[in-house]
UniProtKB/Swiss-Prot annotation:
Organism expressing this protein natively: Arabidopsis thaliana (Mouse-ear cress)
Origin: domain of life: Eukaryota
Localisation: Cell membrane
UniProt cross-references to InterPro entries, sorted A to Z: SAUR_fam
Keyword Membrane attached: yes
Gene Ontology BP terms: auxin-activated signaling pathway
Protein's name according to its UniProt entry: Auxin-responsive protein SAUR64
Amino acid sequence: MMNTKKLIKMAKKWQQRAALHRKRISFQRSSSATSSTAAEKGCFVVYTTDSTRFAFPLSYLSNSVFQELLKISEEEFGLPTGGPITSPFDSVFLEYLIKLVQRRMDADTEKALLMSISSARCSSQCSLKLQERSTQQLLVF
């Protein structure tokens, strides 16, 4: 069992790394790509910032951690109209998250993970505002 403080620290580190490498994954519509990008029945597909594809069972949508992950994805990249769902996290973090969900993490670990995800979302929004301010100050001088 991991210590919750260590888990929070690890999640923050992964989120900071993911924030450095954020990008949007474009959806290719070729005949060869449609078979590989289509989700299996009963699954939904999420792409990470490092272009790794994950297929999750629909039952994961009832998990509060995945709900928070999808909210952050919506805030970061918007709702996809014809393309894939893109996660603001990298594949290492999602693999770790999958292992925690499969092992049925206890309530304390889930709460700590949700708090770290939420705090990283707030800190990334604050850093964007600081970047905007510094850009505006550069333009004034």
